[in-house]
């Protein structure tokens, strides 16, 4: 039996992903060690899990290093990889927003600078609005940018909004809501179709309360 490999995101969504797979009866015994290893092999059921950075999950899946993956919709929209998005997993709820100091709301000028970890999402959003902006790509601590004058606003993912409030920023506009999605490598969907569809079915039953 061919091994099916699944890329799980390290960080805030790991626990929810593990709970979902366990509820679906997928590799229960192996997943209890998820916090200690980067690769977990369930030889009995021919399933291999790997823990990777959330931003890297689509790359692993697109290139076939993983057959399936769990990834936020925000990352999928940013990267636009060549893969299948097959299931909304209904966890990891957050919002992609434009945020900035409160006074920016009243003077939303053109030619503004936008700091973000999601340059493609930001560029597409402002282009649709017909607004001319300069995109500044950052890799972390995006909230700092308006405070130190690097940008007028930011585009970032928000869960509770607490980090924004702590830095004196407010949500100006919501771009889209985001949840975790199940993604599949296109070749794997053909070569391992039966096994992958079985996993999708089990997960869907749990999500739908079956």
UniProtKB/Swiss-Prot annotation:
It catalyses: 1-(5-phospho-beta-D-ribosyl)-ATP + diphosphate = 5-phospho-alpha-D-ribose 1-diphosphate + ATP. Keywords: Amino-acid biosynthesis, ATP-binding, Cytoplasm, Glycosyltransferase, Histidine biosynthesis, Nucleotide-binding, Transferase. SUPFAM superfamilies: Periplasmic binding protein-like II. Signal peptide: none annotated. Transmembrane segments: none annotated. GO terms for molecular function: ATP binding; ATP phosphoribosyltransferase activity. GO terms for biological process: L-histidine biosynthetic process. Coiled coil: none annotated. It holds the Pfam family HisG. InterPro entries: ATP_PRibTrfase_cat (IPR013820), ATP_PRibTrfase_CS (IPR018198), ATP_PRibTrfase_HisG (IPR001348), ATP_PRibTrfase_HisG_short (IPR024893). Catalyzes the condensation of ATP and 5-phosphoribose 1-diphosphate to form N'-(5'-phosphoribosyl)-ATP (PR-ATP). Has a crucial role in the pathway because the rate of histidine biosynthesis seems to be controlled primarily by regulation of HisG enzymatic activity. Belongs to the ATP phosphoribosyltransferase family. Short subfamily. This is ATP phosphoribosyltransferase.
């Amino acid at each position: 039996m061919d091994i099916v490999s699944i890329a799980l995101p390290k960080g805030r969504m790991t626990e929810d992903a593990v709970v979902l797979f366990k509820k679906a009866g997928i590799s229960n015994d192996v997943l209890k060690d998820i916090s200690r290893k980067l690769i977990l092999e369930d030889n009995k059921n021919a399933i291999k899990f790997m823990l990777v950075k959330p931003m890297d999950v689509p790359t692993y899946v697109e290139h076939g290093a993983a057959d399936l993956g769990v990834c936020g919709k925000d990352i999928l929209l940013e990267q636009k990889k060549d893969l299948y998005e097959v299931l909304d997993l209904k966890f990891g709820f957050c919002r992609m927003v434009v945020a900035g100091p409160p006074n920016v709301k009243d003077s939303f000028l053109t030619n503004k600078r936008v700091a973000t970890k999601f340059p493609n999402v930001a560029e597409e959003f402002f282009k649709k609005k017909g607004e001319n902006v300069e995109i500044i790509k950052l890799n972390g601590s995006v909230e700092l940018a308006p405070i130190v004058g690097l940008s007028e606003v930011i585009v970032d993912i928000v869960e509770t909004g607490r980090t924004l409030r702590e830095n004196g920023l407010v949500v100006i506009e919501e771009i889209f809501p985001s949840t975790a999605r199940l993604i599949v490598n296109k070749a794997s969907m053909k070569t391992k179709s039966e096994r992958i569809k079985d996993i999708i079915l089990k997960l869907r039953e749990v999500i739908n309360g079956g």
